[in-house]
Amino acid sequence: MQYQHPSSSALGLSVPLFAPTPLQHPTPFYIDDILGRNSASNGTPALPTPTLPSPNSSFTSLVATYRTPIYEPTPIHPAFTHPGAALAASYGASTYASPLYPFSRPVSDYTHALIRHDSLGKPLLWSPFIQRPLHKRKGGQVRFSNDQTIELEKKFETQKYLSPPERKRLAKMLQLSERQVKTWFQNRRAKWRRLKQENPQGNKKDETESLENICEESQERCLSAEQKSRESSLDDPTSSPTSQGNLDSEVSDDSDQEVDIEGDKGYYNCAH
């Protein structure tokens, strides 16, 4: 629907409904211009503003009232190569020789482009801040693999604290950073203390088991020391007859062990 404006009729130009009136001093923000009182005073009946099919009618009516291009500071889509589109994208064009909206898409599509990333062009300035991807938080949670967790748990059972060289060695073995290993041990110690406070009886059992393990390890060390001393006594050529008698008594008849004994007549191979 088009109408002939008094000032534009003298020039013989046809202006569409949504085109601003090319006044000498345009005042689109005045109440008289918004309500169309100027057109009523000039004898032309004021036409009602058509409703636009948009989810936000107030916003679309505001767009129709201001009559300014939405993507004024942003690049225009290549499809908008029409001379009228270039005129609409300029800042404050003085003449309106061509329609402002020569496109097939309704104005509601442009209003939707303010909310979502539309193919018409870039959204307004606040939209990229809303739609920007969330970056990974520095120092975020690190997920360890099952093998890494098992090795870390084994190391924690034997040693609650790690020295810097041990931490470096363990991190290199598990292909982790020293900071990750240090953080894991700190969290594991905190969990261990919390469980210790919640269940003191279970901690006593753990302490007794650890003491038993220490005793077993010490016994094994003592036995290995005795065995080494016996082997050294067997290898000694100046062993006493009492040691040889003890050796004969220690070796049972069912044993297949072969022992070399040095006597007055040389070495004999005694198979029992």
Curated annotation (Swiss-Prot):
Keywords: Developmental protein, DNA-binding, Homeobox, Nucleus, Repressor, Transcription, Transcription regulation, Wnt signaling pathway
Source species, domain of life: Eukaryota
GO CC, alphabetical: nucleus
Record-linked Pfam families: Homeodomain
Keyword set includes Magnesium: no
DNA-binding region positions on the chain: 137-196
SMART domains: HOX
Induction section of the entry: By maternal wnt-beta-catenin signaling and tgf-beta signaling.
Positions with biased composition (Acidic residues): 250-261
Xref: PROSITE patterns: HOMEOBOX_1, HOMEOBOX_2
Region (Disordered): 222-272
Localization in the cell: Nucleus
One GO BP annotation of this record: negative regulation of transcription by RNA polymerase II
InterPro entries xrefs: HD, HD_metazoa, Homeobox_CS, Homeobox_DNA-bind_prot, Homeodomain-like_sf
Expressing tissues: First expressed in the dorsal endomesoderm of the gastrula stage embryo. The dorsal endomesoderm contributes to forming the embryonic liver, and expression continues in the liver throughout development. Also expressed in precursors of the developing thyroid gland, and beginning at the tailbud stage, expressed in the ventral region of the head. Also transiently expressed in the endothelial layer of developing vascular tissues of the embryo, beginning at the tailbud stages.
Record-level Gene Ontology MF annotations: DNA-binding transcription factor activity, RNA polymerase II-specific; RNA polymerase II cis-regulatory region sequence-specific DNA binding; sequence-specific DNA binding
KW Cell cycle (keyword) present: no
Biological role stated in the UniProt entry: Recognizes the DNA sequence 5'-ATTAA-3'. Transcriptional repressor. Regulates the differentiation of both endothelial and blood cells. Probably plays a role in the proliferation of vascular endothelial cells during blood vessel development. Establishes anterior identity at two levels; acts early to enhance canonical wnt-signaling by repressing expression of tle4, and acts later to inhibit nodal-signaling by directly targeting nodal/nr1 and nodal2/nr2. May play a role in liver development. Induces heart development.
UniProt cross-references to PANTHER family, sorted A to Z: HEMATOPOIETICALLY-EXPRESSED HOMEOBOX PROTEIN HHEX, HOMEOBOX PROTEIN HHEX
The protein's name: Hematopoietically-expressed homeobox protein hhex
UniProt organism field: Xenopus laevis (African clawed frog)
Gene responsible for this protein: hhex
